[in-house]
Amino acid sequence: MAGSQRLKRMADSVQRELSELIRQELKDPRLGGLVTISAVKVSADMGYAEVYVTVMGRELGDEQSEAANKETLDVLNKASGFLRHELSRRIKTRITPRLRFHYDKTNAYGNYMFGLIEKAVQDLPEQSSEDKS
């Protein structure tokens, strides 16, 4: 149980510090919109951290957005060495995990589903007050 608490604390620290680092230190114009870290999962040996990111303002299924998301991941994965080095300066641990970035589609998928529900509700025929009784 203590090990899982330690991993959770490490994941929280990595998420907090990486958010700041990406916002303040990465000046690559290919990053585009607001990059947010939705989750971090640290391996049991703390050797790796799976970092899940989202980019605000991009829709699911849009080909341009998919290409931009891939480019964002490429930029983040190429900067992972720099980010890891900076992370090691901010988080004082014996091991700083290697970073692997993944695009988190849950937020975009939720927005997509919400749009489908809204469209379905709008397409419903108007019910008169007689039908409701």
UniProtKB/Swiss-Prot annotation:
The keyword Ubl conjugation does not apply. Keywords: Cytoplasm, Ribosome biogenesis. GO terms for molecular function: ribosomal small subunit binding. Its main location: cytoplasm. It is found in: Cytoplasm. Gene3D superfamilies: 3.30.300.20. InterPro entries: KH_dom-like_a/b (IPR015946), RbfA (IPR000238), RbfA_dom_sf (IPR023799). The keyword Electron transport does not apply. Monomer. Binds 30S ribosomal subunits, but not 50S ribosomal subunits or 70S ribosomes. One of several proteins that assist in the late maturation steps of the functional core of the 30S ribosomal subunit. Associates with free 30S ribosomal subunits (but not with 30S subunits that are part of 70S ribosomes or polysomes). Required for efficient processing of 16S rRNA. May interact with the 5'-terminal helix region of 16S rRNA. This is Ribosome-binding factor A. It comes from Acinetobacter baylyi (strain ATCC 33305 / BD413 / ADP1). The gene is rbfA.
